[in-house]
Regions:
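Internal alpha-helical transmembrane segments
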Residues: 1-72
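Cytosol/matrix-facing amphipathic helices and coiled-coil assembly/linker segments
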Residues: 2-14, 73-155
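The feature identifies polytopic integral membrane transport proteins across all domains of life
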Residues: 14-25, 47-54, 115, 147-152, ...
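Core segments of transmembrane alpha-helices
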Residues: 29-34, 154-165
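Helix-coil boundary and interhelical linker segments in multi-pass alpha-helical membrane proteins
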Residues: 38-53, 166-177, 224-231
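Structural signature of hydrophobic alpha-helical transmembrane segments
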Residues: 175-187
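Interfacial loop-to-transmembrane junctions
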Residues: 191-216
Length: 231
């Protein structure tokens, strides 16, 4: 594969991972908020209590998702930057050892000895640091994920996912709130299950059924709990 094609594939894979994470974040928003509003609506018919409970859950969930994503990506970025610093130090202190290290990495990644030697020689004529970090650690050199971008994306995806259950539980009349919300959430879960399976190249039917089952179980449990504490 040419260097240009490899770069295109890497960029596409990165965008695909971001999109998949967005779909999963939206899925979390759908299930989490559906569970909260169904449970509260089962316990009380007071629309303001239902709305405030759902709104608080949206804020808590979105900030929790964003905070977790920020910490996770920041840790990953720190680890990747430390790996780059180590390889840079190796290049500065012992060029021959760095060459042997890159050659061994190519061999480990499936190249034959001749090809590994050619690739090593070529890398040290161009950008040895880039080759070292990409081959040894699988890191895209100078393409570190921004933790703020990841956090904002996670916040938005969770918020968007929370809209179907939140809107349906507040818009529909009292007698239709719960069944309408279950129906709308079910459709939304089927869509996110289908989308995540397509992005991951997995069987769509299995993913859709699994996603729907988890959502229905969540809503069923919170509905029963709401009935126990009905006011």
């Amino acid at each position: 594969m040419s260097e240009t094609n490899h770069e295109i594939d890497s960029n596409f894979a990165g965008r695909l991972n971001i999109l998949r994470a967005g779909v999963l974040g939206a899925n979390d928003g759908i299930i989490s908020i559906a569970g909260v509003v169904i449970g509260v609506a089962s316990a009380t018919s007071n629309i303001w209590i239902i709305f405030l409970s759902g709104f608080a859950a949206i804020l808590a969930g979105a900030f929790s998702m964003a905070g977790g994503e920020y910490v996770s990506v920041s840790t990953q970025k720190d680890t990747e930057e430390a790996a780059v610093a180590r390889e840079k130090l190796l290049l500065d202190q012992d060029m021959e050892l760095a060459k042997k290290s890159l050659y061994a990495a190519y061999i480990q990644n499936g190249e034959c000895e001749t090809s590994a030697q050619l690739l090593t020689n070529k890398a040290f004529l161009n950008n040895p640091l880039k080759a070292l970090v990409e081959e040894k650690y699988g890191i895209e050199y100078e393409e570190f994920t921004n933790p703020w971008h990841a956090a904002i994306s996670s916040f938005i995806s969770f918020f968007l996912g929370s809209l179907p259950p939140m809107l349906s539980i507040t818009i529909f009349p009292r007698e239709y709130r719960i069944p309408a919300t279950v129906l709308i959430v079910g459709v939304a879960l089927l869509l996110t299950g289908y989308t995540s399976a397509k992005l991951g190249k997995a069987p769509t039917k299995t993913a859709m059924i699994r996603n729907l089952a988890i959502g229905l179980l969540t809503m069923g449990v919170t509905f029963l709990l709401g009935q126990l504490f009905s006011i």
